[in-house]
């Protein structure tokens, strides 16, 4: 029994075998339960440092009262000398050895031994612990022990394998071997950071093995290998691939941002273009509208200018009738010049006979058309005999009141009665008119009024007077104002058939009446008047005649002229007709009779709507038996002076003919 204990304590299997050798052999084949227990084979393990290892020791059959013991490199592992990371667990029929966080010191030979009443058995295994990322020596061949005895050989093969191992050693010995770290003195065997191990074998001397790093190889790790280059290249590839991926991602992000920015730019540019287009269209529309408005304004201005010009032309010329019918006579408004001729010029040149052309008002300018007989001669057969018999005829203009509306009076054309030169000095003042002078009523070719050549019409002839006029040019009393009427040949030109009628301005007429007491010389005794006088224009007596007018004219005051026989003839046109009234008064030449006649004529002028032809001597020239009562409204005169008999004969001839339609 002492030998068995020693054998257990030493852990040697030979003694066990020796002790069991004395038993009879037939016991092996006996199936009785008296046979000793048998352990299953344990496998050797190789593991990296820090890993967990488990060694199991099992019996092939179940036995009761079994005891297990573990040994490391021949030393029993108990509670005293057992490392902290090794634990032993006992279970029924088996035992386990657990190594937690294995290290290089845990490598070695481990043996399990079972003890029972029937017998003992043991099994062993090698454990190799290497550092991480290193290929360490392995034990690919397992050590087989079957009924281990001192006579049976045990073969252990140790080899180092790996891709970068510096050496591989295999030994075949009779006994067991294991790797142990070299001592401090022996560590210098391996160079370049190699790890030194010693292989201990019972029969052979120890040998050194080197565990080399990746960059070196050889028995002593003396050879340099570019192993780290591959690792670094991989790392570099990874490092380069990552930035590439990042760059790709960044480029994709940039592209997306660029696309968004491009789209935004396109949208902004499109919006700007649309806005500019809209603004341009608005500008074009506004320009067109303003242009149209300007054109309208220009057209209106032109129209107004044209209307003003036409008004001025109508004022100056009246309506144009280039070829008037022979039966119509056109009375045109008197031309008003912008440059008003001074009263002095008018007074100095008013010694000639003036023929009134139109009736002037202060508000309107209109023309009146009168009928004309188809005769183209100044006198027919009857009138020629009368004119030849008459030495002097007193005729006065009946449209002196037309000068009342114009303050200064327009310039007048002159026609020399004896074929002398015409005085056209006043044309200087009419050049600033809108139209040329040849279209004005003062021109020679334009006639403001026409009288029928076949019929003689008495016209008032009066001589204007002014303070500057010499006494020889002073107009005498009306009774002595006679002018010789030489026969005038008919001109082949229509323009010359229309003599220009001159009108005495109202202011000068008033002056003439003021200076009437001073005018004592007779007209036929004044040689200046006879040399410069006009041939008398036959103005017909307007009696009970119809006229046409566009609008009613304002009333014009008509002064009354004194006659030597103290007869005042008042001719009015109430309700568009001309009514002649002849009032016979006593012979008086006082100023009171003048004023009364002027006031009465002013009342009559207010009632006159249109051209009032006032001939104070016409009443004295008319004879009651010669008048046709159906065509005249004149009152017959009671008595006639001897000087008026000739004029009465003339008026009787004129009255027999058709009246002028005013």
UniProtKB/Swiss-Prot annotation:
Topological domain spans for side Cytoplasmic: 289-662
GO cellular component labels: axon; cytoplasm; dendrite; extracellular space; GABA-ergic synapse; glutamatergic synapse; membrane; mossy fiber rosette
Post-translation changes: Proteolytic cleavage close to the plasma membrane on the external face leads to the release of the soluble growth factor form.
Name of the molecule in the record: Pro-neuregulin-1, membrane-bound isoform
This protein's encoding gene: Nrg1
Residue pairs linked by disulfide bridges in the UniProt entry: 57-112, 182-196, 190-210, 212-221
Propeptide section residues: 1-13
PROSITE patterns: EGF_1 (PS00022), EGF_3 (PS50026), IG_LIKE (PS50835)
Transmembrane intervals: 266-288
Residues bearing attached sugar chains per UniProt: 120, 126, 164
Disordered: annotated span: 1-52, 358-383, 398-480, 547-610
Domain commentary: The cytoplasmic domain may be involved in the regulation of trafficking and proteolytic processing. Regulation of the proteolytic processing involves initial intracellular domain dimerization.
Protein's UniProt keywords contain Cell membrane: yes
Organism: Rattus norvegicus (Rat)
Compositionally biased intervals (Basic and acidic residues): 425-445
Keyword Glycosyltransferase: no
Subunit (UniProt): The cytoplasmic domain interacts with the LIM domain region of LIMK1. Forms a ternary complex with ERBB3 and ITGAV:ITGB3 or ITGA6:ITGB4. Interacts with NRDC and BACE1.
Composition bias, Polar residues: 374-383
Function per UniProt: Direct ligand for ERBB3 and ERBB4 tyrosine kinase receptors. Concomitantly recruits ERBB1 and ERBB2 coreceptors, resulting in ligand-stimulated tyrosine phosphorylation and activation of the ERBB receptors.
GO biological process, one term: neuron migration
